[in-house]
């Protein structure tokens, strides 16, 4: 349910150029090998390549985790790891000091087979590390979602309980260590408001707070028109934060630190190809993308943004992108033919 739908020509080598967010909402088996698919957009027939008998269809059934998971680790090196199939992420990295090195990682369809996809989610997904990954001499392809996605979290102010004391909702921990700075941004406009230094952090366990957090997404959606997802149980905590000075902020303003932002991510000499969504989704500051090739990417080769909906950030400030090659990019929207990133 709610999985993306992908269509290939009969040879399995050419994905039909279409928007990748046409999702399957229901599947009805009509018998005699006939299946009726209900989708959100219904635009499978809008592309300039015909969808006809003989075409092959993929409906990934995504699960959590990855074929290879690296969690709460630091300065590990994975050399020449080849991943041919994963029910979730190809490689999943979360938490810890980070700075892990992936040299010669390949996410590809198993050679000499007729497989269509190599993973049912992002090819490489990294989040919440103190230092981001170093991906070198690698190849990522045929993932169901972004080929590479790296980010920290967007936390938010739950309440202002004193001139320099806040209650903060952290997503998978909190994005600031004691002694580091935090930036505040307006909930609606995302305009910068203030900066302060964190002097104390205390994790709270009040069940009333935890239950109230579940209602925040619907409240700010109705009151402010800002759409964010409901945080699933086990993915958030409440913190009391003390700052070094007063700040002029409001409840639900964004609380942005970089302690767990996967900063200093390095991506070099890597081949990104045949991605039905984006090549690199970059949200980690102080990062480098260099000497890479992007080919046959349905959406942007490199997409730099934050996501309020997914609570993913912070902002990829001080990002260096140089000496990369782009071939046949943004080819997944009907009627488009572009080599721009």
Where in this protein do the model-derived segments appear?
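Extracellular polysaccharide-degrading/modifying enzymes targeting complex plant/algal/animal polysaccharides
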Residues: 1-84, 93, 109-117, 141-263
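Short glycine/acidic-rich loop motifs that flank beta-strands on beta-rich extracellular proteins
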Residues: 64-67, 87-93, 110-122, 131, ...
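Short, T/G/N/S-enriched strand-turn elements that build extracellular solenoid repeat scaffolds
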Residues: 68-72, 80, 89-95, 134-139, ...
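Short "repeat-start/strand-capping" segments in structured domains, especially the N-termini
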Residues: 73-77, 95-101, 130-134, 263-266, ...
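Repeat-solenoid scaffold signature
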Residues: 128-142, 185
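Short, contiguous acidic/charged loop-to-helix segments that flank catalytic cores in large enzymes
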Residues: 171, 253-258, 277-278, 307-314
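Active/binding-pocket-proximal capping segment
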Residues: 285-287, 294-309, 316-324, 339
